[in-house]
Amino acid sequence: MKGDQEVQVIVQQGKEPIPTDQDERSSVSGSQTKLSHSNTYKRWLRVAIYTFFVISGQSVATILGRLYYENGGNSKWLATVVQLVGFPILLPYHLLSVKTHTTTQRDGKLTSLRNRALVYIVLGLLVGAACYLYSIGLLYLPVSTLSLICASQLAFTAFFSYLLNSQKLTPIILNSLFLLTISSTLLAFNNEESDSKKVTKGEYVKGFVCTVGASAGFGLLLSLQQLAFRKVLKKQTFSEVINMIIYMSLVASCVSVVGLFASSEWKTLSSEMENYKLGKVSYVMNLVWTAVTWQVFSIGCTGLIFELSSLFSNAISALGLPVVPILAVIIFHDKMNGLKVISMILAIWGFVSYVYQQYLDETNLKKSNEIPTTESPDRPEAEGSSEQSK
């Protein structure tokens, strides 16, 4: 008996180190869970960086653009060019990504050069037109009014995302869009004059219409970018984001430069620099940093489209809404009357409504992802017990 017990103990000890299929599956699932958490943290870190780029780039670029007009600048086409011409700062990264991409091509389905070129040309023409309309609005409207009208861009993006990208319009999002629309509509009745430049009623209406048109153009642009990433480009890499910014900006810059020479505004640029109130150096530095900050905004905006959606990218752009009017009051002494305050409150309310909907979507997505992971450990046990019974 004692010998049999010793044999049983030895056999049991020999069996203990042997891992079962269930242990292997649980270890694999555990490593996959850690990997998914790590990827989630990295993703949201990128989202945070892109968000900072959008808010800071948009705010600084808008203030610099108005500073150009306030101190003697008058060229709408030049103001358009500097919004687009800063893309060469991205060329070093672009060349590096091209070298690494040529050695590691994975997909058998590479987008044809013709389709890719068509995407960049269409988006470039659209962004060039939208930037020109934005420059007209910046010339005739106070910065605080302009930024509040630009909040309507979120409503346009939601509409075009619904048509092009199957974006769901929940009651909360519809409430957000309604508030943003009312917020912009109120400013149509705000006949305000800038302190440094007297603006007629006709010029104010022209600036208002052009700003709304620019908001609609940018809303369509963001939705088309998301559609291009999903249907045409089909490659989930950050280098694709940089490529889109560079080629799209190249097309738009060429169109803007043609407009600058066709309108004969280039003839007045030398005298404009001579008579600039802050001096020649400040004139050049204003244009340079305006170009750089708009590219920072473009990187953040396109990156958010790549990581999440065009509607979320636009919502983050609207998050910087209170920043520009406050800076405009401090720097340019814009008047913050009651109508503007009401418009700002409605715009912030609309933005918060949209963020709440995003929170609900993320919560539901996490719950749906947790259901299969909690059920999966039971399956190996059931299979193991059925095999033992056999």
Curated annotation (Swiss-Prot):
Residues 12-34, 367-390 are annotated as: Disordered. InterPro entries: PUP_plant (IPR030182). Disulfide bonds: none annotated. SUPFAM superfamilies: Multidrug resistance efflux transporter EmrE (SSF103481). One of its GO terms (molecular function) is purine nucleobase transmembrane transporter activity. Expressed in mesophyll cells. The chain crosses the membrane at residues 44-64, 78-98, 118-138, 140-160, 169-189, 204-224, 241-261, 287-307, 312-332, 336-356. GO terms for cellular component: membrane. This is Purine permease 21. It comes from Arabidopsis thaliana (Mouse-ear cress).
